[in-house]
Amino acid sequence: MRSGVIAQKVGMTRVFTDAGEHVPVTVLKVDQCQVVAHRTVEKNGYVALQVGVGKAKVKNVSKAERGRFAIAKVEPKRKLAEFRVSEDALIPVGAEITADHFIPGQFVDVTGITTGKGFAGGMKRWNFGGLRASHGVSISHRSIGSTGGRQDPGKTFKNKKMPGHLGVERVTTQNLRVVRTDPERGLILVEGAVPGVAGGWIHVRDAVKRKLPAEAPMPGKFRELADGAAPAGAVQAAQAAPEAPAAEENA
C-alpha cells in the first residue's frame, strides 16, 4: 500500500483524446509535497507517512512544529496529513513526492471539503419534490411537507431530513481515472469532478477498490535532496527552536 499526496485544486478544463473525444478533467497541483516524519509499529503502533505541502511562514508555526520540521530538515509546511502505508512503501524523510507518483490510466480516490452553500431548503439539500404548483397549495410550494410527527410518537425523530446547512463536509470520490501527469509543473489531471473549491486541499491516494497497475512505481516516485542541502526554511526553524539547557556539573 503506497502513500498518497496532498494536492491543491486548480480548476477544471478538458483534454482531447487521439480519437478527438473531449474528456473533462480536474487539474490538481502538487507543490513540494515532502515526507516530514515516519510512523512505525514500534513507536506508534502503526505504519504511516506524514507528508506536508506548500510553504508556511515561520512566524505562523508553533515552536514544537518548528522543531519537528528542523529535525526532518524540511521547510515549514502549510498542510500536513498522514497516509497509512505498508512497511515496504516507506519513503525517506525529506524526500519530495512528485506528480508522476501516479501513472496515466490508474484509478485514484480523492478526498476534499465540499463547497459551502449556506442554509438550504429541503429541495436543494435533499432533492425533495416539493408540493404541487396549484390545487390548493399556496406559499408552501418548496416546503418539505410533513415531518412524520403525530400523537404517536409525538415528536420528530433526530436526523430527519430537513432544511439546514449544506456543504463544508469531508467527501471522498472514488475511482477517478488519471488522464495525464506533468511532473515538471507538478500537475495531475484526473477525469471528472473533485469535491471542493478552487484552491482547496485535496488528498489523492491509490483507489482501494481497483488493482494497482504493475507499472506504478514502488514505493513511489520521489526525489531526494542532496546531502547537506537543507532548505532555507528548515535552517530558520532550527534557529528559532529552543535550545536544550546545559547540564550542570556536580559539586
Swiss-Prot record:
The keyword Disulfide bond does not apply. One of its GO terms (cellular component) is cytosolic large ribosomal subunit. The keyword Cell cycle does not apply. GO terms for molecular function: rRNA binding; structural constituent of ribosome. Methylated by PrmB. Residues 140-162, 229-251 are annotated as: Disordered. One of the primary rRNA binding proteins, it binds directly near the 3'-end of the 23S rRNA, where it nucleates assembly of the 50S subunit. Part of the 50S ribosomal subunit. Forms a cluster with proteins L14 and L19. This is Large ribosomal subunit protein uL3. The gene is rplC.
